[in-house]
Regions:
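Asp-based, Mg2+/Mn2+-dependent phosphohydrolase catalytic module
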Residues: 1-47, 53-56, 60-74, 83-104, ...
Length: 295
């Protein structure tokens, strides 16, 4: 991992559990999905970097994984930190790539912000506007909460769903976050993400961390993996006794979050977790998956 990336995921770990000591007791083994398909009832996939990437790119073997699970009647879920649209739209995007998740089978980090806005309204301090950094489609998500994107929100609330800020927008966000009682909403907590060509790039979680550091903002709320809210929503969508496996490409979100949630995890190596850095990163974060999933 990049140094800042590792520090971000360590921060996440410490926010979840300052006494984190477990996570290395498992000895992961390399498996193919068909070897463990009978060991779990529900299979939860990360989206970008695990099943697909930008445009119509689909990773080799991903459709075969999905088809196998559908043919066996397994529960499937898309559990994604993509926060630039509603769950219905994210499900439709996945279906267009060959993964026919329904909206009910989709659990996204952005949807969890609904609780923040509801709580603010219940306290008599409704948030109707935010300074928004993200893709244009993200306004659809905000609208589903009854919230507008504004250059000059009445309250100093900044929401980040993707790393799309230019220098002027970044400076404006820092200025807002330096105001009293400012809040930073990190709708997508991914720090780095893989590209189709095999390289990796900083994304929304990295941008949000720089905003936090540069502004000194103390009230920072994180949505999505690895935090418990998204896994609580996932579990609530499944039978109580379901045996659950989280499949993803990121050690610091998919695997660490699954471990904290008490469910199984399988890591796809070499996309968002460089193979050569895997052992060092596992030791640094104090977590390993149950499996390394081979294609």
């Amino acid at each position: 991992m990049e140094p800042l990336e590792l520090s971000i995921y360590k921060r996440y770990r410490n926010l979840m559990d300052p006494t984190w000591k477990s996570g290395l007791e498992v000895v992961p083994r390399h498996v193919r999905l068909e070897e463990i398909v009978d060991d779990y009832d529900a299979f939860c996939f990360d989206g970008y970097g695990t099943l697909y990437n930008r445009g119509d790119f689909v990773y080799p073997g991903a459709r075969e994984w999905f088809g196998l699970l559908r043919s066996r009647g397994k529960h499937v879920r898309l559990v994604t930190n993509a926060a630039s649209n509603t769950e219905a739209a994210l499900a439709a995007d996945a279906a267009a790539r060959g993964f026919d998740f329904t909206a009910e089978e989709t659990v996204s980090s952005g949807s969890l912000a609904a609780e923040f806005f509801a709580d603010a309204a219940a306290r008599g301090c409704p948030v109707k506007e935010v300074f928004y950094i993200g893709r244009p489609t993200g306004v659809n998500l905000l609208h589903s909460f009854g919230v507008e994107a504004s250059e000059n929100p009445r309250l100093p609330v900044v929401a980040v769903s993707s790393a799309t800020a230019d220098d002027e927008m970044y400076a404006r966000a820092v200025s807002l976050l330096q105001k009293p009682n400012a809040t930073l909403l990190v709708l997508n907590s991914d720090a780095w993400a893989p590209r189709i060509d095999g390289t990796r790039a900083p994304v929304s979680g990295e941008l949000a961390e720089r905003l936090r550091l540069d502004s000194g903002c103390k009230d920072v709320l994180y949505f999505g993996k690895p935090f418990s809210g998204i896994f609580d929503k996932l579990k609530a969508s499944l039978p109580v006794d379901a045996r659950i496996l989280m499949i993803g490409d990121t050690l610091g979100t998919d695997v660490m979050g699954a471990r904290y949630a008490g469910i199984g995890s399988a890591l796809v190596i070499g996309r968002n977790e460089p193979t050569a850095e895997l052992a060092e990163d596992e030791l640094a974060l104090g977590v390993v998956p149950d499996y390394y999933l081979d294609v």
